[in-house]
Amino acid sequence: MKEEETTYHVPVLLKESVDAMNISPDGTYVDVTFGGGGHSREILSRLGDGGRLLGFDQDEDAERNIVNDPHFTFVRSNFRYLHNFLRYHDIGEVDAILADLGVSSHHFDDSERGFSFRFDGKLDMRMNKRAGITAADVVNTYEEERLADIFYLYGELKNSRKLASVIVKARTGQKIETIGEFLEIIKPLFGREREKKELAKVFQALRIEVNQEMEALKEMLMAATEALKPGGRLVVITYHSLEDRMVKNIMKTGNVEGKATQDFFGNLQTPFRLVNNKVIVPDEDEITRNPRSRSAKLRIAEKK
């Protein structure tokens, strides 16, 4: 494993996910979450002269991990624009698409990015540092009801309304700009026993809102469904229930809402066949080596 992979992000379920892509040496593949490049390097190692791989990442920091390989093309973009960039690169159908939806270790460990409550720093949380609102913008400008909805929907926090109320009251006196200031406001709401878990949910909710993660995932999954050729594989690693539900729905019904559609004769219409009915999870050895892989779930579907 290359040094940049271990410092930026350790690839999760590496062999299992790339094996699931059913790589053909001359095939065309997409890694929509390039990150540290771990999965992409493994894919490239299995390609021949006619093979091709596109790697997507919206974070400029990921560009330093770009693979020097003639079969690789890096796309600095949010994966929600998958359809646009496949057209731009004159690619019709692809053989497999891989998505590792976990936040890179680099983001959690870089105090300047504001993703973790372990460090003080600016409340930022943007995956793309050049675009969008920050977490500070969310906590300082959103109405109380909207804040409560975000914490409830994206963090699944039971005390979302109380949390929103405390934040709104605190910001009337002074703008909340740093993680330290934010923690001082919200920590009293959580008991010491569950503090870390509850804070993780709060930060997850803000990160999802800042980066519009659910909307982006929906657009990517719909584009992936269209882009895959018959027999092509959709391979996705999820880390929390919200994204996992969306992925499970698209694979089972062909839409993220999970609404089953039937043809005139009552037959279930779905673009995919499930390759693994039971999710694949990291073994104890991988969890020991990389504790952040603990919540990972691998789902695989094949286009009909």
From Swiss-Prot:
InterPro entries: RsmH, SAM-dep_MeTrfase_MraW_recog, SAM-dependent_MTases_sf. SUPFAM superfamilies: Putative methyltransferase TM0872, insert domain (SSF81799), S-adenosyl-L-methionine-dependent methyltransferases (SSF53335). It catalyses: cytidine(1402) in 16S rRNA + S-adenosyl-L-methionine = N(4)-methylcytidine(1402) in 16S rRNA + S-adenosyl-L-homocysteine + H(+). Its main location: cytoplasm. One of its GO terms (cellular component) is cytoplasm. It holds the Pfam family Methyltransf_5. One of its GO terms (molecular function) is rRNA (cytosine-N4-)-methyltransferase activity. S-adenosyl-L-methionine binds at G37, G38, H39, D57, F79, D100, H107. Keywords: Cytoplasm, Methyltransferase, rRNA processing, S-adenosyl-L-methionine, Transferase. It is an enzyme of class 2 (transferase). GO terms for biological process: rRNA base methylation. Its EC number is 2.1.1.199. It is found in: Cytoplasm. Belongs to the methyltransferase superfamily. RsmH family. Specifically methylates the N4 position of cytidine in position 1402 (C1402) of 16S rRNA. HAMAP family: 16SrRNA_methyltr_H. This is Ribosomal RNA small subunit methyltransferase H. It comes from Bacteroides fragilis (strain YCH46).
